[in-house]
């Protein structure tokens, strides 16, 4: 047992998803094309497991196979169960399945949440254990090498954006013709919504969307400063990140990219002067919630995030790497060995007894967002100062919703399997919109 890793994952993975799960109740997102294709390629009657299924997005892609989902997060499992999926709560490090029981397994956006190399290996080995010989395993993880964003370390914290979720919930309700009298998720109240209905919140702040983005900028700015100072008091919990604080705002995950789809374009923001004066190395936000369409700082304009949802035949820019003599599951060029091995970075953590704020009707951040929006109804010349003070008070809550990720270098995931999980053979690997993906097959006894 590695208590530091367990505590880190508890605070910055499990607690975050448990408290943000209500935001996913009414959100509908599309299956990623490559994952969908992998599931549809399975033989009829196959038994498929989705380890880390979340709300069950991939459990009904192929009606010709039997799919079982499991996730560590109980609230997400409950959402999937309410959607008619066969799901259960379990731990990826100790799967409650017999050996060699599944014909195929998918692990989408899970392995990068394990905070040590040993735990990542254990998670993959456990999936290999329950995979039948000849069965295939698909794994997606965040990539360190991304076209329009940069990570300076492999172990990073990424802020969860509740305001963005609330906006999409609002737009989803409106597009379905729902109003306040329609049922809402248990225990969920959208930020700034007096009655708890996301539509009401949208109606009040539709004309102030750009102001709400300014609010997000202030939160991002003060969040870094407050966390940096508190990290010093916590014996360096966050001090090991250094410049990796900058990478909070240069990242995108599978779930966050789905939230971007329906958001309207808003004006770019100016770079706040306080960014340059902060003691923590920071840069303007590239997180989807904070700066949606500012010019890309590191490259020319890249593909829109919506392109991940187009038909796979149109994804010409997707380059897949194949190991010699493997199947033709993906088209692409050959090559792509391991550039360098894992750096072994890990975060020192000290338990301060902080509790994660739950997303309920008494959520203080909800009232603060409402007050911030209301401030623009007046001609108060000090509205910007008040927003800064509000953001400072929100800094602690923002820290509570920071998610941990280990971002993988090119070739690192393949090397991890080849060196530490000998029962698996990598068939193909590639980069899919900022994520490394591999497909591996479990070796037969005579291989």
Curated annotation (Swiss-Prot):
Keywords for the protein's UniProt record, in alphabetical order: Methyltransferase, Phosphoprotein, S-adenosyl-L-methionine, Transferase, tRNA processing
Phosphoserine PTM sites in chain numbering: 212
Keyword Methyltransferase annotated: yes
Entry's Gene Ontology BP terms: methylation; tRNA modification
Gene3D superfamilies, A to Z: Vaccinia Virus protein VP39
EC number of the protein: 2.1.1.-
GO molecular function: S-adenosylmethionine-dependent methyltransferase activity; tRNA methyltransferase activity
Keyword Coiled coil: no
Region (Disordered): 274-306, 320-348
Bias (Polar residues): 276-286
SS bond partners: none
Protein family membership: Belongs to the methyltransferase superfamily.
Role summary: May modify wobble uridines in specific arginine and glutamic acid tRNAs. Acts as a tumor suppressor by promoting the expression of LIN9.
Protein name as annotated: Probable tRNA methyltransferase 9B
Source organism (scientific name): Mus musculus (Mouse)
């Amino acid at each position: 047992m590695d208590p530091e890793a367990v505590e880190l994952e508890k605070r910055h993975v499990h607690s975050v998803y448990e408290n943000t799960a209500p935001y996913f109740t009414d959100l509908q997102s599309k299956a990623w094309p490559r994952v969908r294709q992998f599931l549809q390629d399975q033989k009829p009657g196959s038994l498929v497991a989705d380890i880390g299924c979340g709300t069950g997005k991939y459990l009904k892609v192929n009606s010709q196979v039997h799919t079982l989902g499991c996730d560590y997060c109980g609230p997400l499992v409950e959402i999937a169960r309410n959607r008619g999926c066969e799901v259960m709560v379990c731990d990826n490090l100790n799967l409650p399945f017999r050996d060699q029981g599944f014909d195929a397994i998918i692990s989408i956006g899970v392995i990068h949440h394990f905070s040590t190399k040993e735990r990542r290996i254990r998670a993959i080995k456990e999936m290999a254990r329950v995979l039948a010989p000849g069965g295939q395993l698909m794994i997606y993880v965040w990539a360190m090498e991304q076209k329009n964003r940069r990570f300076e370390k492999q172990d990073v914290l990424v802020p969860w954006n509740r305001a963005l979720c609330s906006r999409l919930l609002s737009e989803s309700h409106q597009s379905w013709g729902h109003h306040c009298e329609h049922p809402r998720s248990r225990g969920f109240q959208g930020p700034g919504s007096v009655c708890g209905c996301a539509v009401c919140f949208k109606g009040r702040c539709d004309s102030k969307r750009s102001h709400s983005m300014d609010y997000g900028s202030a939160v991002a700015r003060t969040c870094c400063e407050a966390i940096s100072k508190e990290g010093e008091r916590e014996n360096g919990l966050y001090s090991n990140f250094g410049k990796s604080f900058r990478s909070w705002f240069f990242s995108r995950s599978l779930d966050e990219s789905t939230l971007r789809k329906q958001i309207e374009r808003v004006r770019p923001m100016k770079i706040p002067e306080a960014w340059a004066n902060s003691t923590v190395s920071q840069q303007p936000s590239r997180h989807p919630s904070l700066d949606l369409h500012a010019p890309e700082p590191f490259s020319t304009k890249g593909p829109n995030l919506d392109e991940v949802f187009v038909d796979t035949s149109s994804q010409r820019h997707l380059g897949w790497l194949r190991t010699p003599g493997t199947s033709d599951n993906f088209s692409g060029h050959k090559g792509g060995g391991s550039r360098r091995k894992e750096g072994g970075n890990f975060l020192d953590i000290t338990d301060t007894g902080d509790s994660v704020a739950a997303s309920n009707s008494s959520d203080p951040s909800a009232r603060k967002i409402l007050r911030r929006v209301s401030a623009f109804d007046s001609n108060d010349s000090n509205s910007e100062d008040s927003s800064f003070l509000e953001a400072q008070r929100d800094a602690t809550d923002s820290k509570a919703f920071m998610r941990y990720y280990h971002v993988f270098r090119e070739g690192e995931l393949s090397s991890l399997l080849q060196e530490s999980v000998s029962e698996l053979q990598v068939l193909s690997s590639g980069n899919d919109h900022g994520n490394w993906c591999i497909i591996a097959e479990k070796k037969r006894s005579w291989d």
